[in-house]
Amino acid sequence: YRTDRNDSLLPPSNVSLYGDVSTVGFYLLGVRGNHLFPKDKYRLNYNLYFYSFPSLYWGRGYDNGANSDNESDYKRFQAQVKVDFMFRLAKNFYIGPMAIFDYIDGRDFDKPELWEGMAARTTNTSLGLSLLYDSRDFLTNAFHGYYLRIDLRFSPAFLGNKYAFSSTE
């Protein structure tokens, strides 16, 4: 869809429903999109998804991980909402804040003792900054151009996070 039908140079905005399923029990369902404001001065990018898959866990630390007898099955469920609002600084260059919320739930543990009292459920709230260079001719199926992005993500304890961390992607 287009936010300004009179601007033929503005790439169309988009929204997509996506999913995946596998024979081992993995499934994923999500919605993602890019809303380009008139004259491409601002961009709203979003991605919401949830998935579940069977996984393996050996316990915390090297010694537990090196012990093949510790291999245990569990089911992991995760949901994430990620939103960023970008401001155009120069042609093809954007910067803006982002927010992320994660919900993770472990279920059906074969060996719950390996978790050493860790909660089966956790949430995480993050704030951050995104830097973007995007010269693609078409956002969803580019023929020309470049897409370079750096996300700085901070998940401090004062946002209610039990496991505070930061990351760069």
Q: How would you label these PLM feature ranges?
A:
Residues 1-123:
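Gram-negative/organellar outer-membrane beta-barrel architecture
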Residues 2-14, 53-56, 130-159, 164-169:
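Surface-exposed extracellular loop regions of Gram-negative outer-membrane beta-barrel proteins
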Residues 26, 99-159:
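Extended hydrophobic/aromatic-rich secondary-structure runs
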Residues 79, 93, 125-127, 146, ...:
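Hydrophobic core residues within well-ordered beta-strands of beta-rich domains
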